Amino acid sequence: MAKGMDIEIAPLDEDHVRAKITWSEQDVGGGKLVVEVTVKNPKTRPKADDQLRSDARALAVRFARAFADTIEN
């Protein structure tokens, strides 16, 4: 299993997109975490794909850190 993060963004309607974030680790036991998040993308100030990916990446990192903290405790 390759280590890294993949983000797929798909439109849901004119105001929302779905970000599917797949986080993979390559270590002893390895693992994969998949999170799907619906994000509001206002028509008045829509975000470019790069901005959406950046937001999704930041969210994935926060989620992974919180998840790791629960495992350690």
Language-model-detected regions and their locations in the chain:
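Acidic, low-complexity intrinsically disordered segments
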Residues: 2-6, 31-73
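Short, charged/polar N-terminal "headpieces" of proteins
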Residues: 1-26
